[in-house]
């Protein structure tokens, strides 16, 4: 025992607390000196000694019919600094009041010492009846460990839990696997969550426990070593599990050392501290990213091997009496009861290219899976490969063939990634496996994200995607060959983590891949351009003024043709959706659709002239007039004309006919000088906040502060000033989750905005700090675009997306007498990437001195 208990009798809670602190200090000082298994078992031994001494002091050892038994993680001797003390007090019969009082005092003492205690008092008969009804109780009893008391009584409990009528092998197995299925669903079937749970995430410690429980129930194997000795796992599987288990134990132990309350989630602030304790080093976030890469790789190995062994148990133990249906596929493969099997265990060693045929057959037989024996042969073969699979000409042909098979991403490429075949095929893949970026934007590792992009592309073929992604669905469904898009998706982030521009490096990688695989010059150029430019459409749509003809022209010139536009649109939408499920919403859908349509029009018109928006303005006026005639027939045409004469042409370009008609219906007979209306009916993809009032100081500041205080996301701001000094302000907002705003919330915001605009004072902004943002730093960057423009100035601001940022920026605009014409508000995880169109107080573009003043004030106040 590394840290023996050294407390004299009688024990006191204060003395125990001091001894626990001494133990924790010992563990902190010796964390890197001892193996993690020694530290974990030492804790268990410490608790054993404490509980046995306390049991004896309470006089419970003098009672013949009562025993103290460790269960759960304590029963397994897996005790971490904040683990619960789980134990069973096994009694021969219901305790008499005197014994019951001693048991109560025993448990109360542990509570007084600050322990989290999970306890039960049961007879053998109660253990049987309750264990039969509850798989959790049955599992706890299965891993029971005797501490002190009546040993024969404990042995009787052990015999009970082994009986087939307590839990049959099949019943126990199915119940535990169902628990795993439900647990995986809670974590979206991926281990690669932003702030993962060491215990419950897929591939976490619970997956190891499942393997342990099944083996324990089946054969009584107590440890991984016992399972190895039984022949149930191979030596290399044992080695990988043991290494991964040791790493997760280290992370969990370190986490518990830095916390004061039990938790197994690796939150951002904890990742930093744990990485330091584990000895990871590097500049900036490198230490955390290195640790998390090791962490996710450990989860992946545990998930892969434990699920493979669970499948092996199902196929070779539970299904051993099942009737066999065999279908011969070719000389090397056969289908046995819908499981793909090798006809010769040496196939993959002798003919490595045939590894890819295994996944080809998965695409051809929708209900089939891969037999566990074949998966094990696959793992052995991958470890022994003398070269990358892509170096084998036959393998290259088979790899390309996969892209054109039905459900190829779901049925072939996802499993290929899961089982390590992509690593064996692509030289660059291993570098991105488990690579997590320490930010709030990318919620998956780079490899997981890449496969999700490919899977999202494949989903565009489904009819369900027609409503959510109408343009991508139409384009992707009509493509005769989708191979190029899938390859572009495979490579779009493959160079991350190397340093340098990942898009530029990835473009070189994909060009080399394409040449190696025999693609022609046009295909090579298209692939390289797609990877190099995969962020172009996203930046243009979300951070530029797409109603500016020059922006559309510049984008069209970069894209060059309709084919590339189609490819880029599909890749961009898939990339956004696969980065973070909360990023895509109806507002973004309308934004990208508009850019796509404008660019289509530019290609159709030709590249010699800018798009003529005067036609767009006239068309929108005409359509708005038709809507007004149909839906608002009581409005006099002369009133409409008088109102529209006050509006600049820009107003009719930037608003849809429905919006124009709605605004007109509200304003044409308006008497008041202030109007705030909010609706979901007229703006594509968001809730529109429409404000009409006389221009006033700090107007934008008041509006954004109020909207922010009510916890809405602002996506777009448009300020139109009439010739007589009134403003038509339109803000596109959503709830924080991207949903449209419901009626009660709209009415509440209308009232709040009206009060704010009637007040001469600026209300103080109530800011609730974001827990996650506290652990990130974003370097503030102010960039002025197209500085030769004379009519306005375009500015891009990158900063930490802290609460009140937009209100702070608008306050600075007010203080410098700057007019805001338009704004695009984009949040990328913890980073705000906002775009503003400004003029000075004379309605002109800012000169160099004014730009420099603005830049310095922003840096001084924001970053």
Swiss-Prot record:
SUPFAM superfamilies xref list: ACT-like (SSF55021), HD-domain/PDEase-like (SSF109604), Nucleotidyltransferase (SSF81301), Nucleotidyltransferase substrate binding subunit/domain (SSF81593)
Region (Uridylyltransferase): 1-328
Activity control mechanisms: Uridylyltransferase (UTase) activity is inhibited by glutamine, while glutamine activates uridylyl-removing (UR) activity.
Chain positions covered by the region annotation Uridylyl-removing: 329-687
Keyword flag Repeat: yes
Cofactor needs: Mg(2+)
Keyword Transferase: yes
EC number: 2.7.7.59, 3.1.4.-
GO biological process terms held by the UniProt record: regulation of nitrogen utilization
Pfam families to which the protein is assigned, alphabetical: ACT (PF01842), GlnD_UR_UTase (PF08335), HD (PF01966)
Domain ACT: 688-772, 794-863
Keywords assigned by UniProt, alphabetized: Hydrolase, Magnesium, Multifunctional enzyme, Nucleotidyltransferase, Repeat, Transferase
Catalyzed reactions: [protein-PII]-L-tyrosine + UTP = [protein-PII]-uridylyl-L-tyrosine + diphosphate; [protein-PII]-uridylyl-L-tyrosine + H2O = [protein-PII]-L-tyrosine + UMP + H(+)
Ranges of residues in domain HD: 446-568
Domain comment quoted from the record: Has four distinct domains: an N-terminal nucleotidyltransferase (NT) domain responsible for UTase activity, a central HD domain that encodes UR activity, and two C-terminal ACT domains that seem to have a role in glutamine sensing.
Record family assignment: Belongs to the GlnD family.
Primary role: Modifies, by uridylylation and deuridylylation, the PII regulatory proteins (GlnB and homologs), in response to the nitrogen status of the cell that GlnD senses through the glutamine level. Under low glutamine levels, catalyzes the conversion of the PII proteins and UTP to PII-UMP and PPi, while under higher glutamine levels, GlnD hydrolyzes PII-UMP to PII and UMP (deuridylylation). Thus, controls uridylylation state and activity of the PII proteins, and plays an important role in the regulation of nitrogen assimilation and metabolism.
Protein name (database record): Bifunctional uridylyltransferase/uridylyl-removing enzyme
Gene: glnD
